[in-house]
């Protein structure tokens, strides 16, 4: 890995992928073998790679029948277009659309609602305001939220300690 930094404070994209994957397996009400689709971030970008690794780690790709996996480049409109195609292609068999971020999740939700498919379970990562509201409204399955306030506060503490020449941890993880 890259060692040319003083300290890292945060959580990993893999952890967010693991949490999202576990939710779909354990909490969503979906059954093993159900057909799902995955909307990814830009291929090769760290968020996409990490979140997909998280899905793999918890067995999501083996538990479900993943009928489609494609990038929407973190964009709502691209995700909506993909979801529209998949809803048409797979019909009633498509049970869920798992999104690597909430902006794409909101696009998939718009497509599902427009198609009258309120049964499709959709979830993502980021804790976007409209995604959190949609979870409260019962239209969006889940939004995995990274604790940005905790990351920011701890980041400041670590930076101050480093500036004072105090010993600091090279890697500080902030729980979700």
Give residue ranges: language-model regions.
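Short beta-strand segments enriched in small/hydrophobic residues
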Residues: 6-7, 35-43
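Hydrophobic alpha-helical segments within soluble ligand-binding/sensing domains
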Residues: 9-34, 78-79, 128-131, 147-164
